[in-house]
Design a protein with these regions (language model features):
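Positively charged, small/polar-rich N-terminal and surface patches that mediate targeting and assembly
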Residues: 1-126
Length: 126
């Protein structure tokens, strides 16, 4: 079995569903993420500028190739409304082989604005 390129889950949180969708669609369209789960109804408690704050947020779980972390983080910072967005990388120690291959193949870092690659690349599951 061929060794696959490392993948990661990158996590960020946002204050609105609209921003969660905006960031998710942008990252996928730019080829920076294969799949993003948007998890609603988080409660975040944190210290900011000398005060304890509590907010409702949406969590984004971004699946991508590990090599794209810096580019994904920069894209999130460019789009995000927060002054200091959370951007954390969790390298995936193990994943089901076919899923791993799909994430690695689809997160190319290259946008597909014309939909030229409407079908997924041929994946070798051996």
């Amino acid at each position: 079995m061929a060794e696959l390129e490392p993948i990661s889950v990158i996590v960020t949180s946002v204050g609105t569903e609209q921003q969660a969708v905006e960031i998710s669609e942008e990252l996928v369209a730019r080829g920076l993420a294969t799949c993003i789960n948007v998890i609603p109804c988080l409660r975040s408690i944190y210290r900011w500028k000398g005060k304890v704050c509590t907010d409702s947020e949406y969590l984004l779980m971004i699946k991508t190739r590990s090599a794209l972390f810096d580019t994904v983080a920069e894209a999130i910072r460019d789009i995000h409304s927060y002054e200091l967005p959370e951007v954390l990388e969790f390298p995936v120690a193990r994943a089901e082989h076919h899923f791993h291959a799909w994430v690695a193949a689809m997160a190319t870092g290259v946008p597909d604005p014309e939909g030229e690659h409407e079908s997924e690349p041929e994946l070798n599951y051996d």
